[in-house]
């Protein structure tokens, strides 16, 4: 049998092992894995490289339409491809209007035409004003629903995203449980965080340490406990977003041990940055929940290696530079991190701390695909989409602003020495990024809808 592509001699991350083996691709799908697979129109030699499943980034903000001056599909998905991401799950906020019904998600589909370098699944929003329209987004094919129990959205803009109170969360969770949809939650106590933040600003406390102190660990833990209990009563599957503290992870672990259907994610910045570094970097490292101290970071690594965190995500949430101006308490909170999830975490987790390659593959791709029902994604296995990232280990480079593909070429990782490189990204059998050639094909990404899986 003749194939379209054979990838030879790479160390391939499979479900439960990593070994040197060849991969055959035909019609955009993985056709065979083994040795002496036969002939192909194209043969790639991956000697000395790790071949990983393409990353499934389950938490991205692209901001188009409506705020394309923050980030856009063209720049955002090119950055993703350069970083080894082949599928993103896009959040329903930062763009205008927020993705809260059929009409608003259709605007996103229109805005992205001809611009997607990678594939994209969608989340709908659960907000204070759309509980009667949740079914519309389910019918279109979103793979989950995002909500905030922390304060969010611009109150001066009618169609911006909004947080939910406990009643709205409970009613929404009941409806989404009936639809078989997971609820993803940003967990921080809104009233306490808001009051602590205002108190700090009024007293002139505006440093990174002051910001972190205004969003203490207990505000995350309390919110996680609350939504766990409400989701349990409502009968809804739950996913906790961007957990920043080991204490927060412990709440999820406890609920899981009691039989609750709950998963969680975290982000590279909680593992490789700490509050002192946040102070040095400045507003580019501001996010919520915040980047905490070194002791907290050590606890997060323990939870990650224990298998208590399901997936790693970027929470890519950029904005124009002027929104990062001024002091840390006033600046926009969001990190541009899409392009450097895989290389940074391969360096820090695999090379520096000895994480196994199969565990790395699960955290970066497989588990997210499973959680959100992306049946063709996240695994190097026969029948799956042929989506790979080639990683060159022990290959250090210093990230510069010019390396970045974002609309605004800034990141808290600029200046960092990263000990691994993404050399090639393949989407459904085609090279979409190559370290030498750049982006060799026109954008071929597609939207992934739940009912098409």
From Swiss-Prot:
Modified sites of kind N6-carboxylysine: 146
Record note on modification: Carboxylation allows a single lysine to coordinate two zinc ions.
InterPro entries: Allantoinase, Allantoinase_bact, Amidohydro-rel, DHOase/Allantoinase_Hydrolase, Metal-dep_hydrolase_composite, Metal_Hydrolase
Residues involved in Zn(2+) 2 binding: 146, 186, 242
Reaction(s) catalysed by this chain's protein: (S)-allantoin + H2O = allantoate + H(+)
Complex formation: Homotetramer.
Protein's recorded name: Allantoinase
Protein encoded by which gene: allB
């Amino acid at each position: 049998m003749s194939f379209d592509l054979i990838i030879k001699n790479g160390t391939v991350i499979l479900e439960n092992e990593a070994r040197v083996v060849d991969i055959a691709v035909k019609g955009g799908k993985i056709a065979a894995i083994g040795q002496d697979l036969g002939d192909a129109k194209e043969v790639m030699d991956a000697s000395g490289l790790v071949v990983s499943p393409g990353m499934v980034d389950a938490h991205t903000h692209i901001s188009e339409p409506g705020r394309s001056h923050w980030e856009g599909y063209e720049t955002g998905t090119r950055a993703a491809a350069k970083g080894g991401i082949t599928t993103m799950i896009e959040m329903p906020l930062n763009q205008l209007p927020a993705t809260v019904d059929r009409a608003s998600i259709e605007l996103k589909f229109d805005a992205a035409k001809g611009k997607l370098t990678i594939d994209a699944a969608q989340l709908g929003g659960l907000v204070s004003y759309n509980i009667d329209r949740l079914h519309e987004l389910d019918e279109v094919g979103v793979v989950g629903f995002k909500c905030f129990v922390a304060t969010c959205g611009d109150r001066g803009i009618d169609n911006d995203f909004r947080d939910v109170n406990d009643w709205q969360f409970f009613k929404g969770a009941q409806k989404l449980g009936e639809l078989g949809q997971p609820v993803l939650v940003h967990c921080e106590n809104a009233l306490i965080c808001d009051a602590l933040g205002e108190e700090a600003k009024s007293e002139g406390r505006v440093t990174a340490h002051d910001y972190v102190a205004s969003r203490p660990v207990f505000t995350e833990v309390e919110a996680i406990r609350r939504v766990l209990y409400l989701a349990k009563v409502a009968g809804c599957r739950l996913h906790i977003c961007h957990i920043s503290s080991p204490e927060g992870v412990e709440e999820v672990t406890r609920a899981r041990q009691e039989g609750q259907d709950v998963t969680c994610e975290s982000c590279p910045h909680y593992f490789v940055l700490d509050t002192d570094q946040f102070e040095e970097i400045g507003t580019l490292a501001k996010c919520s929940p915040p980047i905490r101290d070194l002791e907290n970071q050590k606890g997060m690594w323990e939870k990650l290696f224990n298998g208590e965190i399901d997936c790693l995500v970027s929470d890519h949430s950029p904005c124009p530079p002027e929104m990062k101006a001024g002091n840390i308490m006033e600046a926009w909170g969001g990190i541009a991190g899409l392009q450097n999830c895989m290389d940074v975490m391969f360096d820090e987790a695999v090379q520096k701390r000895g994480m196994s390659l199969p565990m790395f593959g699960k955290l970066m791709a497989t588990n997210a695909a499973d959680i959100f029902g992306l049946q063709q994604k996240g695994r190097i296995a026969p029948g799956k989409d042929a989506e790979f990232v080639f990683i060159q280990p022990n290959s250090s480079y210093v990230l510069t602003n010019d390396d970045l593909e974002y609309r605004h070429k800034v990141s808290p990782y600029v200046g960092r020495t990263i000990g691994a490189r993404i050399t090639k990204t393949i989407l459904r059998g085609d090279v979409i990024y190559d370290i030498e050639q750049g982006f060799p094909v026109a954008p071929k990404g597609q939207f992934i809808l739940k009912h098409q899986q």
